[in-house]
């Protein structure tokens, strides 16, 4: 792998990523996916560096994926558990981060229920001249960059397994359906998919898809559309991304019932008939079977890319950690 291919910086949002930067990540992830296919699934790219996974919010896929990615790169890992940490004794989040910094941490992967926490920690590190890099692993309803990047990688690899690149999506239609209001995944995917040139259609109930989401479209003219009915979004779609109803983030009763939601916006075989032949389904997980997607569709290998998304996540997160670490070590 070439050296110095990336200017090391924090990854907090995809809002200002360029197509070139997306392609660097896709190409780097492709190299690491090849590594993961070997008998010895480990390279010394980050040997001697320390990655701290600071997850202030519960996570299964993202936390384990980042931990495994770091270990596959030979980094040392520190894993934070809020229930057994000094937070229970009144320590601030910033002081917790500074403690990990004092232990020699080179990169911090941070998840928090409140938007802006990773950015605040990154800003504090910069103000004090520390070289540690911060990667946003999901902050409130703001963004989840690594999830959107693994979604992008999964789609592009399907379109070209040897040379995935963002330009492959220029003629594609992608529907994002569900609880978009509370979804940090949706926000990051809006940035990445519209940057690719894809036509992105959002669909959800008016309570879960406020009209202001159309404002994103002003930054990417004629590439983002908002629908309060599912049919226009699915019509001739090449990919359908369905999102979990995040009941834990809902401050009020936004839906009459889960059954009615499934009737109106659930992905079923009948609804997929509106899409292009060969349509594929994505979901960031965890999935509420029978709510946002019919259980049989989730398990159908001809339609579902959900397992591939989880697998892709390791290679993509290896790429992100490698690039944040300087991209200088030989594999």
Swiss-Prot record:
GO terms for molecular function: amino acid binding; aspartate carbamoyltransferase activity. GO terms for biological process: 'de novo' pyrimidine nucleobase biosynthetic process; 'de novo' UMP biosynthetic process; amino acid metabolic process. InterPro entries: Asp/Orn_carbamoyltranf_P-bd, Asp/Orn_carbamoylTrfase, Asp/Orn_carbamoylTrfase_sf, Asp_carbamoyltransf, Asp_carbamoyltransf_Asp/Orn-bd. GO terms for cellular component: cytosol. L-aspartate binds at residues 89, 184, 244. Disulfide bonds: none annotated. The keyword Transferase applies. Keywords: Pyrimidine biosynthesis, Transferase. It catalyses: carbamoyl phosphate + L-aspartate = N-carbamoyl-L-aspartate + phosphate + H(+). Pathway: Pyrimidine metabolism; UMP biosynthesis via de novo pathway; (S)-dihydroorotate from bicarbonate: step 2/3. It is an enzyme of class 2 (transferase). It comes from the Bacteria. Belongs to the aspartate/ornithine carbamoyltransferase superfamily. ATCase family. Heterododecamer (2C3:3R2) of six catalytic PyrB chains organized as two trimers (C3), and six regulatory PyrI chains organized as three dimers (R2). Catalyzes the condensation of carbamoyl phosphate and aspartate to form carbamoyl aspartate and inorganic phosphate, the committed step in the de novo pyrimidine nucleotide biosynthesis pathway. This is Aspartate carbamoyltransferase catalytic subunit. The lineage of its organism: Bacteria, Bacillati, Cyanobacteriota, Cyanophyceae, Oscillatoriophycideae. The gene is pyrB.
């Amino acid at each position: 792998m070439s050296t110095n291919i990336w200017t090391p910086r924090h990854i907090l949002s995809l809002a200002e990523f360029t197509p070139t930067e997306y392609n660097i990540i896709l190409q780097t992830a492709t190299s690491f996916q090849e590594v993961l296919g070997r008998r010895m699934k480990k390279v010394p790219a980050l040997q001697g560096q320390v990655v701290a996974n600071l997850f202030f919010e519960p996570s299964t896929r993202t936390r384990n994926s980042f931990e495994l990615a770091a270990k596959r790169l030979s980094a040392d890992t520190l894993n934070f558990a809020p229930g057994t940490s000094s937070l229970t004794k009144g320590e601030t989040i910033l002081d917790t981060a500074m403690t990990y910094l004092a232990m020699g941490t080179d990169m911090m992967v941070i998840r928090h229920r409140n938007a802006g926490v990773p950015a605040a920690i990154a800003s504090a590190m910069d103000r004090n001249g520390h070289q540690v890099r911060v990667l946003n692993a999901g902050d409130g309803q703001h963004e989840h960059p690594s999830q959107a990047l693994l979604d992008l990688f999964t789609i592009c690899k399907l379109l070209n397994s040897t040379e995935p690149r963002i330009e492959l999506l220029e003629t594609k239609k992608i529907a994002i359906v569900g609880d978009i209001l509370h979804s940090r995944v949706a926000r990051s995917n809006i940035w990445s998919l519209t940057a690719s040139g894809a036509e992105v259609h959002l669909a959800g109930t008016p309570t879960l898809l406020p009209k202001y989401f159309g404002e994103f479209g002003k930054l990417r003219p004629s590439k983002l559309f908002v629908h309060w009915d599912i049919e226009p979004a699915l019509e001739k779609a090449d990919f359908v991304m369905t999102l979990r109803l995040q009941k834990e983030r809902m401050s009020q009763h936004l839906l009459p019932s889960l059954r009615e939601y499934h009737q109106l916006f659930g992905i079923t075989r009948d609804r997929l008939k509106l899409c292009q032949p060969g349509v594929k389904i994505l979901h960031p997980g965890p999935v509420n079977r029978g709510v946002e997607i019919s259980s049989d569709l989730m398990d159908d290998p001809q339609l579902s890319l959900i397992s591939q998304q989880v697998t892709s996540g390791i290679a993509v997160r290896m790429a992100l950690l490698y690039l944040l670490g300087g991209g200088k070590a030989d594999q």
